[in-house]
Each structure stands twice: as structure tokens, then as C-alpha cells.
Regions:
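Acidic-and-aromatic substrate-binding clefts and catalytic sites of carbohydrate-active enzymes
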Residues: 12-21, 45-51, 80-83, 114, ...
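Active-site groove signature of glycoside hydrolases
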Residues: 61-82
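Short, acidic/polar
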Residues: 1, 49-65, 111-121
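Conserved, mostly hydrophobic/aromatic
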Residues: 1, 9, 24, 38, ...
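A structural motif
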Residues: 6, 66-69, 103, 126
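A short, structured active-site edge motif that brings together acidic residues
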Residues: 34-46, 72-77
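Beta/alpha (TIM)-barrel catalytic core signal, keyed to glycine-rich beta->alpha loops juxtaposed to Asp/Glu
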Residues: 77-185
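N-terminal binding-site loop/beta-alpha segment at the start of enzyme catalytic domains
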Residues: 1-36, 67, 99
Length: 185
């Protein structure tokens, strides 16, 4: 990937049964640390007590063998997880890691309604957000509204699921006709 110009790598504590971070480290160890951008995520739904924050974060740094994360996300925020994160002071913990230089950009990935997103955006200062954005979810999951909330707040957007896990890569003939009718060019 690096030789083809791809330099942004996204992993998470739980991906591939906890093996993804180590696999990313193995793949990137031959490259200078400043030649790629690494994103990782705090598994919000797993958190039960504040002590877990340091344990998990340090384990991620060790697994990734990276020293710092370029992008770090509160993973899969939705209303319930967001409320619990406030009592655990997750944002404050991660903001401190950012101040220490262990995180360059602090953000979140999101899976809920625009109303919940607005609440999250209004309550903290974010460097970026990651939302599910594709032509199907634009209306169905109100991704357009989410995108507008973030852009109005000057929060950069990272897109996840642009092809919805590959399901949008092959279109049905009827879908092709509809898209062509909407924009023949």
C-alpha cells in the first residue's frame, strides 16, 4: 500500500479479534514513523471503569509499536456510550494524552442520529469525526444531516463505509438506470 501512495492506516483494539494492531505494526515497521498516518480507537463499549483507559491505551501503543497515534477515536459513539463516557471522563483522559504528544488529532466515530451528533459536537472540542457516508446512507441514516452538522462546526470528516462493506460496489441494473437517469454524465 505504501508503495502505491496509501499512507493512512486504520486499526482498532477489537479488529480481527485483537490481532489487527499487531498486524499493522508488523506491516509498517520497515517504514519511518513519520511516513504514514496511524488511526486507532478506544473500544468505548468495553469500558467499565476509568482505570481501563490507561491499560488499553498503553496496550495499543505496545501492540502498534508506534510511540504515538496520528488519529485517535472514541470508537462507535452513540447516545448510551456517550453518556457513559462522560462519567468515565474518557474525553479528558484522551485530551491529556494529546497534550502529552501521544495523540496528534482527537476525534470519534459515530453511529446514531443527527440529534445525538449535535449534542456531542456542542459539548467538546474535536479535531475530526468519522461517519458512515455513502449514497445509500445519505438519506436512510441521515448522513447528509450528520455531514452538515460537522461541516458547520468546522470539524473535518473522515468517511467510513463509502461502499457499505462492499455491498455498493456492484449495483443492480435498476440502480444503475436510476443513477444514470439522475446524472447521465
Amino acid at each position: 500500500a505504501m508503495s502505491c501512495g496509501c499512507n493512512y492506516f486504520d486499526t482498532a483494539y477489537v479488529y480481527h479479534n485483537g490481532l489487527s494492531e499487531k498486524a499493522v505494526a508488523d506491516a509498517l515497521k520497515k517504514y519511518p514513523r513519520d511516513s504514514y498516518l496511524l488511526a486507532d480507537k478506544m473500544p468505548m463499549w468495553m469500558l467499565e471503569k476509568p482505570e481501563q483507559l490507561e491499560e488499553i491505551f498503553q496496550e495499543q501503543l505496545n501492540r502498534c509499536q508506534c510511540g504515538y497515534f496520528d488519529f485517535y477515536l472514541m470508537h462507535a459513539l452513540e447516545k448510551g456510550v456517550w453518556e457513559r463516557s462522560k462519567s468515565l471522563k474518557v474525553y479528558e483522559f484522551l485530551a491529556a494524552k494529546k497534550a502529552e504528544g501521544k495523540i496528534r488529532y482527537l476525534g470519534f466515530s459515530f453511529h446514531d442520529t443527527p440529534e445525538v451528533l449535535q449534542e456531542i459536537v456542542d459539548q467538546k472540542k474535536w479535531d475530526f469525526a468519522q461517519i458512515q457516508l455513502n449514497f445509500l446512507d445519505w438519506v436512510i441514516y441521515r448522513s447528509r444531516e450528520q455531514y452538515e452538522i460537522l461541516t458547520q462546526a468546522d470539524i473535518p470528516v473522515i468517511v467510513m463505509e463509502p461502499l457499505r462493506g462492499g455491498s455498493l460496489a456492484t449495483l443492480t441494473p435498476k440502480t444503475c438506470e436510476m443513477l444514470t437517469a439522475a446524472d447521465p454524465d
